[in-house]
């Protein structure tokens, strides 16, 4: 509630975004989650008790989320599939959107977009602060242009490249409504969700 109450125009608080996804999930939905930092918040608010309703990998590998969601939906079309992905995780398996678009696999892909590999930045801050002096995190901003970190990647454009409809949301209620519609989806959809949490300059 605190996250929702604090919401204002602009990127969503990660906890508010997680609540919005959980609130919209159809009762029989399968969640494929590969969102390292936002996933922690999502697991706090999910209320699923049906076996096979939550798919997540363990260990250090990245990039399974998009492909796992497409495969899960193609293998069993009796349940809606919602993939919750971090922007960094999505970059490791973005080509999986080709299969979703080509075969019209009705998965709802929710990309939590904070514009960076946040968990790696946090690791560097904790274990190796020497390499981040001056606020430089080389290669860890998912951005472009001379003002790196300010222009987040546009996942709508990426989805559209693969023939997938895409939207960007700026309010929790919008996200809840879109996730709820996954129950009757007949085609893939990507939802680009700008979230807060960008690592500030040090």
PLM region descriptions:
Residues 1-76:
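Active-site diphosphate/adenylate-binding microenvironment
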Residues 79-151:
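Conserved thiamine diphosphate
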């Amino acid at each position: 509630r605190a996250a929702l109450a604090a919401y204002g125009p602009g990127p969503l608080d990660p906890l508010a975004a997680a609540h919005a996804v959980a609130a919209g999930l159809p009762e029989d939905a399968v969640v494929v989650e590969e969102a390292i930092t936002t996933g922690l918040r999502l697991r706090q608010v999910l209320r699923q008790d049906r076996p096979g309703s939550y798919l997540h990998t363990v260990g250090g590998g990245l990039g399974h989320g998009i492909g796992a969601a497409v495969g899960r939906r193609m293998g069993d079309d009796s349940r809606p599939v919602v993939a919750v992905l971090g922007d960094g995780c999505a970059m490791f398996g973005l080509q999986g959107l080709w299969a979703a678009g080509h075969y019209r696999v009705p998965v709802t892909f929710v990309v939590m977009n904070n514009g960076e590999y946040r968990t790696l930045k946090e690791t560097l801050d904790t274990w190796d602060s020497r390499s981040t002096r001056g606020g430089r995190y080389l290669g860890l901003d998912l951005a472009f242009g001379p003002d790196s970190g300010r222009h987040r990647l546009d996942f709508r454009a990426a989805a559209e490249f693969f023939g997938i409809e895409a939207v960007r949301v700026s309010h929790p209620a919008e996200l809840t409504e879109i996730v709820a519609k996954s129950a009757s989806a007949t085609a893939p959809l990507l939802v680009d969700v700008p979230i807060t949490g960008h690592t500030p300059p040090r």
